[in-house]
Amino acid sequence: MARRYDSKEAKRRILTACVRLFLEKGYTNTKVAEILKEADVSAGSFQNIFHTKDGVLTELISMMFSRQFGAVRPLAANAPSPVYLYAVETALQLAVTELSENLRDIYVEAYTFPATAEIIHRSTTAELQAAFSAYLPGCAECDFYEMELGTAGMMRGYMARRLSLIHISEPTRLLSIS
């Protein structure tokens, strides 16, 4: 008997399956066939909704980065400057990638794939502008976007290498740097 196609429900199942599989196996090691089996959807349904595995990652990154700074705001709520929010969020991303190879894989892919990287750039540009515009009053949004391109390149570089094996003896040191 053919499965009834409910795109919202299928999308939810695919996203749920991908979150679990990406965290368990990493982005690179998760195969589309595993996603289809876990989500109990057909290849056609998957392709109609997301087209590719990168399409799922784009959706997840969009959801995550729309909330990421908001989740960190309480940690920097009493800080004397909005710059602290940016510093805490940056340190948190680096620490998370040091603690989990599968999260490292997801973040590196997100900072590499053009569609997801653009989501990160746009989201972070707004945060950079909010944090640093008082210190850089002559900068326009495009200037903050260019700054984000540079910092994102550095972030990807640091995420792609296991820092604790190179220079850092404890991943928590990243949190104390900022």
Show the residue positions of the predicted features.
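Helix-turn-helix
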Residues: 13, 21-55, 59
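A short secondary-structure junction motif
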Residues: 43, 63-71, 96-100, 104, ...
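Hydrophobic alpha-helical connector segments
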Residues: 59, 70-103, 111, 121-123
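Amphipathic alpha-helical packing segments from all-alpha helical-bundle domains
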Residues: 109-160
